[in-house]
Amino acid sequence: MQLIVVSGRSGSGKTVALRVLEDLGYYCVDNLPVNLLPQLIVSVESQYDKLAVSIDVRNLPVSADKLETLLAQVRNEGRVEFSSFFFDAENSTLLKRYGESRRLHPLSRKQLSLDEAIREETNLLAPLSSTADLRIDTTSLSIHDLSELIKTRVLGKKENELVLVFESFGFKYGIPKDADFVFDARFLPNPHWIPELKPFTGKDEPVARYLSSQPDVMQFILQIENMLATWLPHLERNNRSYVTVGIGCTGGQHRSVFIAEQLAGAFRLLGKNVQIRHRTLDKSTPQH
């Protein structure tokens, strides 16, 4: 049976995630007390082959060690194919979402301000965040974008296979929080300053032809490829479900896009399960 544990800070998109997983055929349980997870698995494994469970900050064990031990037990005992998704967003975004929805934060009963509750929740959920197979930052995602991203991650994954995600981005918009590795391409030649190349992206032939003619660019790609190829077997043996590689340039339109596309193509040729995302291009904004 496949099991996905959904967690994250309140307001970050857990409810949307659970709704998408239900549409994908998962039997979903919202806000399950963590200590009931082993019993739930036993009770439903003969009826369902896909289970998704949402864990809320209100239903955590008192001890963080107990939480880590319980999840490790479920992950390692072999009854389920275990994956965990952690959803998050910037504090300012969470504050804005709560202001718009006028909902109470789950920790508001502790007589904390909203800002204090959000920060306290961060500490309480740290064990789930640090051990998640996939972290998704929803700060700049619409509900539709988040739904499509979850579908891509879930449907694009084969059983017990590591998914390698290449993600281009612009440093001017911030580093993606879901990245396991981040590479900075801002020192490389920038097509933005070449008038005839500026309107294009790293997916277009004129930019690709220019960047592929730059020795530093190609050496940078080769060295990233060699590093990942060296360590991916170790990550696979460690039962990782996802590895997200962030490639950043100034605005996320030219260099980072080209490099992410080149790396994705190289690892597809090696038979890896590869997904690609261009954060700036996906917003459809003309940044460089």
Curated annotation (Swiss-Prot):
Alphabetical list of NCBIfam families matching this protein: PRK05416.1 (NF003828)
General function of this protein: Displays ATPase and GTPase activities.
Family designation: Belongs to the RapZ-like family.
Keywords: ATP-binding, GTP-binding, Nucleotide-binding
Protein name as annotated: Nucleotide-binding protein ASA_0318
Top-level lineage group: Bacteria
Binding, ATP: G8, R9, S10, G11, S12, G13, K14, T15
Presence of the UniProt keyword RNA-binding in the record: no
